[in-house]
Amino acid sequence: MKKIPQISDAELEVMKVIWKHSSINTNEVIKELSKTSTWSPKTIQTMLLRLIKKGALNHHKEGRVFVYTPNIDESDYIEVKSHSFLNRFYNGTLNSMVLNFLENDQLSGEEINELYQILEEHKNRKKE
């Protein structure tokens, strides 16, 4: 797994668009982000440049536009950020996080049943 750079929340929104398309040009990134944000094209281009400098994106020129591809996998990013979150707030244990949600009534009965099912399926796969 590659080293994961620090990515701001805004930059993460840009990365999500690029992960979704895997290869996308500047105009398409701007068009996609204009659906969900009020950022100007210049702001989006600045974020793209920052992500390149951080090593999160690769780019090359095709004709008159730049094409961007992710340099880090979305699954790797999520894994690192998930572990960071657990370490930061729950001393690295998933049990503590789930217990916190249970104790604060933040999980419905349906969600608890779904978690139970997931755990059972995972347990059965481990046995095989």
Swiss-Prot record:
Q: What is its main location?
A: cytoplasm
Q: Where is this site: Cleavage?
A: N100, F101
Gene3D superfamilies, per this entry?
Penicillinase repressor domain, Winged helix-like DNA-binding domain superfamily/Winged helix DNA-binding domain
- The segments labelled Important for dimerization in the record are 73-128
Keyword Iron assigned to the entry: answer is: no
Q: Please list the GO terms describing molecular function.
A: DNA binding
Report the PTM annotation.
Answer: Upon exposure to beta-lactams, proteolytic cleavage at a single site may impair dimerization and abolish repressor activity.
Disulfide bond sites: none
Q: Which residues bind DNA?
A: 6-70
Q: Extract the InterPro entries matched here.
A: BlaI_family, WH-like_DNA-bd_sf, WH_DNA-bd_sf
Keywords, A to Z? Antibiotic resistance, Cytoplasm, DNA-binding, Repressor, Transcription, Transcription regulation
Task: List localization entries.
Answer: Cytoplasm
Task: Name the GO cellular-component terms.
Answer: cytoplasm
Question: Is Ribosomal protein found in the keyword set?
Answer: no
What are the GO BP annotations of this UniProt entry?
Answer: negative regulation of DNA-templated transcription; response to antibiotic
What is known about its subunit structure? Homodimer.
What is the protein's known function? Answer: Transcriptional repressor that constitutively blocks expression of beta-lactamase. Regulates genes involved in antibiotic resistance. Binds DNA as a dimer.
UniProt family annotation: Belongs to the BlaI transcriptional regulatory family.
Q: What is this protein called?
A: Penicillinase repressor
Organism expressing this protein natively: Bacillus licheniformis
